[in-house]
């Protein structure tokens, strides 16, 4: 599939031009984080083979690892059955969470 065909498969309109994106460790299967992508960040992710996201608080694109060095190298990208959520499997360098934890999901509730 080329980039335009990939973008046609994704329903960006449901989430105000943003889609939730689950980041999972390619090797262990551990869920590392959830972030949001728009078309531009998905295009940059595919072009660079590293994850790019849309920051809802800063309203700007950001490349995971650009500041910390904890890059995420894309191994595969999957779309869900409704076309409105992505699962990206990555090779994670260092911790995924800005707190220094491997995963953003380190706090158990139950």
From Swiss-Prot:
GO biological process: L-histidine biosynthetic process
Claim: Lyase is one of the keywords in the record: no
Family annotation (Pfam families): PRA-CH (PF01502)
Pathway: Amino-acid biosynthesis; L-histidine biosynthesis; L-histidine from 5-phospho-alpha-D-ribose 1-diphosphate: step 3/9
Lineage top rank: taxon: Bacteria
GO cellular component term, pick one: cytoplasm
One example GO MF annotation: magnesium ion binding
EC number: 3.5.4.19
Residues reported in the UniProt entry to bind Zn(2+): 81, 97, 104
Keywords: Amino-acid biosynthesis, Cytoplasm, Histidine biosynthesis, Hydrolase, Magnesium, Metal-binding, Zinc
Compartment list: Cytoplasm
InterPro entries reported for this sequence: PRA-CH, PRib_AMP_CycHydrolase_dom, PRib_AMP_CycHydrolase_sf
Sequence similarity: Belongs to the PRA-CH family.
Subunit structure of this chain's protein: Homodimer.
Functional description taken from the UniProt entry: Catalyzes the hydrolysis of the adenine ring of phosphoribosyl-AMP.
Protein name, entry field: Phosphoribosyl-AMP cyclohydrolase
Natural source organism: Clostridium botulinum (strain Kyoto / Type A2)
Name of the encoding gene: hisI
């Amino acid at each position: 599939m080329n980039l335009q065909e990939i973008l046609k498969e994704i329903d960006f309109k449901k989430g105000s031009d943003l889609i939730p994106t689950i980041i999972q460790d390619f090797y262990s299967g551990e869920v590392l984080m959830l972030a949001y992508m728009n078309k531009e960040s998905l295009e940059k992710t595919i072009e660079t083979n590293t994850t790019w996201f849309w920051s809802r608080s800063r309203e700007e694109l950001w490349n995971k690892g650009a500041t910390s060095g904890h890059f995420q190298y894309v191994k595969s990208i999957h779309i869900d059955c409704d076309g409105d959520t992505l699962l990206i499997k990555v090779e994670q360098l260092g911790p995924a969470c800005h707190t220094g934890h491997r995963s953003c999901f380190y706090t158990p509730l139950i």
